[in-house]
Amino acid sequence: MPIDVDAKAHTEYICPKEEFDRILARFPETSYFHLSLVVPYNVGTRIGETFAIDLEEDVDFSKHELKIKGQMYKIEKTWFIKPPKYDSHRTVKIGQTLEKELKYAIKQRKINRLKYGGAYLKTYLLPDNSITQVRADITVPHKEITPLCVKDNGELVTPDSFKYCARVIHWELGNHLFHAHCLRHTHGTMLAEGGVNPKTVMERLGHKDIATTLQTYICCITAKP
């Protein structure tokens, strides 16, 4: 069976730093898509894991750590938080660059809450792990969460929302190889190229087993001329 070269190139696409910088110039820190780009590039999260991150609960600046403990997924028109793929709960180290981005987002979130007041949309996790949003001036007896990505007024940004970001990168920036998973793949490749132990790569990315890591990254690196 002939190989679809375009499909193969799309699947294996690694985003060069210069290209990633160009993407961030289009989606700067003031954009509600910004963190959905910088987190997988720096941590290697899956798209559902990225959007399930809680800025208040999952980030520990004192330990320079980020917890990956869920993924956002949709059933019909409702979004839920469920355990990550393969139940791969993990805590990963983060660097100063990502910490700076996260601190800015947290600060801006607080500013926007004051700006919008009662009209700000707070996000809650219901007992069935579904997500709902309610105006800040309405009291709700459920657990409030702080999603990684929201609009200025608190409106939830989801993996479906990211499709718009990808379309802009495809058509406005002219990068048709870009896709949501490529930033995770790029991070894993950078780790492998940097000589990081395969077991460490496996644990950081939440792979099911070491064979997946070796097949996806290490073999690709050793195959390079």
Tell where the protein language model's regions lie, with residue ranges.
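Catalytic-site neighborhood detector that most strongly recognizes the C-terminal catalytic loop/helix
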Residues: 6, 14, 72, 205-225
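Conserved tyrosine-mediated DNA breakage-rejoining catalytic core shared by Y-recombinases
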Residues: 2, 53-137
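Basic, Lys/Arg- and aromatic-enriched nucleic-acid-binding interface segment
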Residues: 1-47, 51-53, 89, 112
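Extended hydrophobic-aromatic, low-complexity segments
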Residues: 36, 61-62, 68, 77-78, ...
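Short, flexible helix/strand-to-coil boundary loops that buttress conserved ligand/catalytic motifs
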Residues: 24-27, 54, 63, 106, ...
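Generic alpha-helical hydrophobic packing signal
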Residues: 38-42, 51, 65-67, 101, ...
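Short, basic (Lys/Arg/His-rich) helix/loop patches that form interaction surfaces
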Residues: 21-30, 43, 92, 111-118, ...
